[in-house]
A protein has these predicted regions:
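Positively charged, amphipathic and often flexible ligand-engagement surfaces
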Residues: 1-308
């Protein structure tokens, strides 16, 4: 793993730096490129703007592992509010949820019950819940919960999951999820993982991403290909064209503030694009992972630091 990426991932776990950044005006200003803001109203404002540009949205209330049932239910309430707002404002948006925010590390039963309530709410309002994938020690339990919820009549089709191409296990996971008809967001993976569970080289991750993309495109389920890598985008477009796969059968997904030029270009070409819009007060770990992923993001940060 490149030194720069390792450094920013390590900094994402630095609590004193996190407190300083999340509480300072400078930190909020620098993060605004990638974070919609701290409040629900900020997220709605950005979602409406993205929709006007012809793109869909997935909303993410930032925050990871909670330490109590009360915190888990408080996190869930934000998402219930979002589902109601999406319906009332007629936003082209869904929600992305981390199970650790729903208490997974305290109780699997708690996390699954909260995810069930969100999926029921989503289905009742014609919406959809994407369960985010976290580090590899949570992969199996996350997939188990998603599969159980999708098997329930009252939530079937209203819940999907994320698969990370850098994990060795992902091909088998994709095949099982496709057999169950579960919608997938395919990404490369943003967490630091050991070579025992993940491909260590970018070229291997890219190769697996392309392989898994083709499996998704060949299915009759609507999926999202989450990448800012133009080579990955080009490979998917080429495969879809060669196999007469309609553009309505998949979408590209990208992060708010990253590769806006590519987002606009894909929309002009007639491809579906969904923008991942995060918001909330606990934005620091997410922000640092974005810096770890792309050197261009670090350059952007440096320029704006000196302007600030």
């Amino acid at each position: 793993m490149p030194v720069l990426r390792s450094t920013f991932i390590a900094l994402s776990r630095n609590r004193p730096l996190r407190r300083f950044c999340e509480q300072s005006r400078l930190g909020s200003r620098l993060s605004s490129r990638f974070i919609a803001g701290t409040e629900i109203a900020d997220a709605v404002r950005v979602a409406e703007s993205v929709n006007r540009q012809g793109m869909a949205v997935t909303l993410d209330s930032l925050g990871e592992s909670v330490t109590s049932d009360v915190e888990a239910h408080r996190s869930a309430e934000v998402y219930h509010q979002l589902l109601d707002i999406i319906e009332s404002r007629k936003l082209n948006a869904n929600i992305s949820v981390k199970l650790t925010q729903m208490g997974l590390e305290q109780s699997q039963v708690l996390a699954e019950s909260i995810a069930l309530s969100l999926a029921q709410h989503a289905k009742a309002t014609g919406n959809f819940v994407r369960i985010d994938m976290e580090d590899s020690k949570l992969t199996q339990v996350t997939l188990d919960i998603v599969r159980r919820l999708n098997a329930r009549p009252e939530t079937k089709g209203a819940i999907g999951v994320v698969i990370q191409a850098y994990l060795y296990r992902s091909q088998a996971d994709v095949e099982q999820l496709l057999a169950d008809g579960i919608r997938i967001r395919l990404c490369k993976g943003a967490y630091k993982e050991p070579a025992e569970v993940a491909f260590p080289r970018k070229s291997e991750v890219d190769e697996n991403f392309v392989l898994l993309s083709k499996k998704l495109l060949d299915s009759n389920v609507f999926h999202g290909l989450a990448t800012h890598d133009e080579a990955m985008v080009a490979a998917a477009k080429s495969y879809a064209k060669q196999h007469s796969i309609a553009r309505s059968r998949f979408e590209f997904q990208m992060l708010y503030g990253v590769r806006r030029d590519l987002q606009r270009s894909l929309v002009k070409e007639g491809f579906g694009v969904r923008v991942y819009v995060p918001f909330g007060r606990e934005w620091y770990p997410y922000f640092m992972r974005r810096l770890a992923e792309r050197p261009a993001n670090v350059i952007f940060l440096a320029k704006n630091f000196f302007r600030a």
